[in-house]
A protein has these predicted regions:
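Zn-dependent metallopeptidase/amidohydrolase metal-coordination segment
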Residues: 76, 158-217
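Midchain, well-structured core segments that form catalytic/ion-binding scaffolds
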Residues: 1-135
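Generic hydrophobic alpha-helical scaffold/packing signal
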Residues: 74-77, 94, 111, 150-153, ...
Length: 219
């Protein structure tokens, strides 16, 4: 049978929270190739890819740019040993927003920053890839699945809440495939940090919500 609906337990927060807006997510990979040289004997002949990366990164945005847009440098990998001018550095980053215009502007900012660095360090090679990982979506108030979820939440004695999220989930991909998908909270907090935790009582409620929704489908 063709799957028509999906309830995704992947939201940060309590299970009474329903995600109604999620962003489009872009990744970018910047590869910088300088020239290796002995750091103590012949540094003049080297081109430090790490130094170029350090010049490039401040030209890019960082953090929360507005209420629905974020930009982040996630990893920097460069050099092999301390006594060699580093030849290769890779910068991996991302930006997210539900706004197409904002995303287009950020893509241009990344490209412009790279072009500035290319012009400044002409003996180095600076390449980049910018690509979309998943697309944004918006759940309308009359979405039948969201309405059923809200009703089930009320049946558990809770008040349903809707919110925007900067995170992505299976729902982004499912919705691209034509599957009406809604994300609810899974009792997780401080996601993607060393202080991430789950509130057990919320997790139990999430399980009860899942059970109730399955029973409603069977009925």
């Amino acid at each position: 049978k063709t799957i028509k609906e999906a309830i995704v337990f992947d939201g940060e927060g309590a299970p009474n929270e329903i995600i109604t807006i999620a962003p489009t997510h872009f990744s970018f990979d910047i590869t910088i190739e300088g020239r290796a040289a002995h750091a103590g004997v012949d540094p003049e002949n080297g081109i430090s890819s790490i130094h170029i990366a350090a010049d490039l990164i401040p030209r890019l945005p960082q953090g929360r740019l507005d209420h629905e847009t974020t930009f982040n440098i996630g990893t920097i990998k460069g050099g092999n040993v301390r006594n060699s001018v580093p030849q290769n550095t890779i910068i991996n980053g991302e930006f997210r927003s539900p706004s197409i215009e904002t995303l287009d502007g950020l893509k241009m900012q990344v490209i412009e920053a790279i072009n500035q660095v290319k012009a400044k360090y002409q003996e180095a090679n600076v390449d980049n890839q910018i690509y979309a990982n998943f697309k944004s979506y918006k759940i309308e108030k009359d979405n039948p699945l969201a309405i059923r979820i809200a009703s089930a939440i009320k049946s558990l004695g809770l008040s349903p809440k809707t919110k925007c999220s900067g995170g992505g989930s299976d729902a982004n991909i499912f919705r691209e495939k034509g599957i009406n998908s809604v994300v609810v909270g899974m009792a997780d907090h401080n996601m993607h940090t060393l202080s991430e935790y789950v509130i057990i009582s919320e997790l139990v409620t999430a399980a009860k919500l899942c059970e109730l929704l399955i029973k409603k489908i069977k009925d």
